[in-house]
Amino acid sequence: MTQGRDPKHIKRLRDLVDGVLLLDKPVGLSSNDALIRAKRVLNAKKAGHTGTLDPFATGLLPLCFGEATKFSQDLLEADKTYEATVHLGIKTNTGDTEGEAIETAPAGVVDAVTDAQIEAALARFRGPIMQVPPMYSALKRDGKAYYEYAREGITLEREARPVTIHGLEFISYEAPMLKIRVTCSKGTYVRVLGEDIGAALGCGAHLNALRRTQVGPLTIDGMITMEALQAHAEPLTLLAPVDALLASFPSIELTAELAVRFLQGQRLALGKEAVAVPAEPGRVRVYSDGKLLGTAQLQEYAILAPERLIAKAA
């Protein structure tokens, strides 16, 4: 038996796959299917994504492999940026192009919408808002997804939830297509935002296209298509390091002695043995000799409390 076919050797190779793939998800592919395909190409043992994109949406889908999966929750909680095309004048039952038209504005209404009206409408949705989640969503009630109820013709009462629209930029309007850029908090449905903008303009709307361009500190720079991934001779070279997920947190460098204690899960009182301790308490990246050890909470009086640890230095 050759080493290349030795199951133990293959397992060792799979265990070595650590990092983040910045995938440009295509239209029509679910986030889970994208993850399965990428995991197969990379021959990875452990994989996870950082929050789903609807099948009709495209753009940045960060996929985590190996040790990076320990930190995927950080991007689930992170702010996200999208470029969206809102089709004014037609409302669908799903809020996007996959649904059926249920309302159509009278002729001429959409053509009469002005840039000033759009700017005024967008201003209403900047900052903290309350948003009612859509029926066509993966939220659950009594163990059953909302979209399953919707497909049965059942509409549930849904409570509005607080979300924050950090940025809402008017890009262009060529009737009936309105292009916007949205930066929003976790839990925001851009489909619903598009519908609400249409309602504010008095003409109804649905989302015609959606492209995600940023998730937390990760941007479209270095993003790769599924086709390019599958065709690449050395796909593992496409992975960003694990700490790419944590770039928004300040860092601490530990001596070798402190690093051993940190990896044992010990709380550390930092003194001269740590370099460049952040001034404010909070979450930090922890390194030793330039290698990521994990994350921790920097507490008052320079106490470092381990949080998530890397099994092998990254």
Question: Model regions: which residues?
Answer:
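Glycine-rich loop at the start of a catalytic domain that most often binds anionic cofactors/ligands
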Residues: L60-K70, L75-D79
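Accessory RNA 3′-end/elbow-binding domains used by RNA modification enzymes
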Residues: M1-P26, N32-H49, L53, A57, ...
